[in-house]
Amino acid sequence: MLGPVNARTPVADGISAPYAKYFRSRPHHPNRSTAWGGRIAHNAAMLTRLPPHVRTFRRAAPRRAWRLAVLAPVLTLLAGCGSAGYYWQSVHGHLSLMQAARPVDELLADPAVAGDLKARLALARGMRAFAVSDLALPDNASYHRYSDLKRRAAVWNVSAAPPDSLELRRWCFPVVGCVGYRGYYDEAEAQALAARLARDEGLEVRVYGIPAYSTLGWLNWAGGDPLLSTFIRYPDGELARMIFHELAHQVVYVDDDTMFNESYATAVERLGVQRWLATQAGDAARRDYAAFDGRRQAFRELSRQTRRELEQVYAPKPALAHDQKALYAMKDEAMARFRQRYAQLKADWAAAGTPFNGYDAWVAGANNAFFGIQAAYDELVPGFEALFAQVGGDWPRFHAAVRELARLDTGQRQARLRALAGGSAVKS
């Protein structure tokens, strides 16, 4: 995900809850540095390039002096775009993440590093190599280092939508344009923004942790995106998905079109992990991935069905134009059906001997912001998958075709992808 992020797809997948067990063994030390406005820190950092002697970040000195020297002009440039404090803390938060990074090769050679972490790092290194050789993803500085963040998420995103629409509130930033989320390194700051949006603007809000984000390749000169403790212990197939998704953001990224960007990266991760599992993974990893992905697709379909129902409720209807009570009653009915269907889905999983409650928190707090986030990650995936089939599964041709789509305006891009998918995005 630009995430993301999260993101990445973690939001659409409900990944925070299903993978909570991978975080519980790790102490939480809140990082008071705040704010990642979507993919914002990279925009600030790229505006002023650091000299080679500070490229590792960890050994540069005096640290405070060079940070101020580099970031002061950046903040001046950004002041006209929004809160200087927000951007300052965005840059500080990302620098803290970069300072914590150590080369993977160094960690693998360090006898003090735990064997289980070494195994995950070695696996991730192989996945990155596979992404380059088999998926035509970029071979650059990203994922050659590892950062132990000592917290459960890389950033916390805030999304918001009106009570009668799935259209996400958008925040606009330099270089990346406008996105449907605003991110923070400190969860308390994210919750505070969400509370203000709900109180002052009457919006429905969602705060969610993101395990990874992409700097879109702009910071390869400074070491690229590191592997993070927030996702390194994911099951094999999920770890591969994360790496493939974030690298895809470095191939194609279109300003002001979150749905296009995230759907493309989601298609890359899905298609890529299928190939990785078929050629690189063992039977156990394939079984585990099939089980989890089956649940994920069932939950996505359930969410997609409810989105369609809510879109019909919110569509302009003269009879409801002045009857908010009727509109909200229909909305409540759609939400109730969503929760009833989810309860049945859980019962089916339990009956099949694979009980799972990883989506419970998402369902309990489901609102317009939740469904708006979901749409960003999967709405156009079928079109991208159809495009991949159209080019014969040739990865370089696929990426080139996506670059051509990126040259079109938003409406044309979406129309082409929906046509490729057969007229509507109903399956991923």
Question: What does each of the following model-derived ranges do?
Answer:
Residues 77-80:
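C-terminal motif of bacterial Sec signal peptides marking the signal peptidase cleavage site
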Residues 126-296, 311:
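Acidic/His-rich structured neighborhood in mature extracellular/periplasmic domains
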Residues 82-85:
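Bacterial signal peptide processing site
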Residues 87-115:
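Post-signal peptide N-terminal segment of mature Sec-exported envelope proteins
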Residues 47-70:
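Bacterial N-terminal signal peptides that target proteins for export
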Residues 97, 110, 117-124, 183-187, ...:
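Solvent-exposed, acidic/flexible segments
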Residues 7, 14-20, 29-30, 43-44, ...:
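Short hydrophobic alpha-helical segments enriched in small aliphatic residues
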Residues 301-428:
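Pan-zinc metallopeptidase signature
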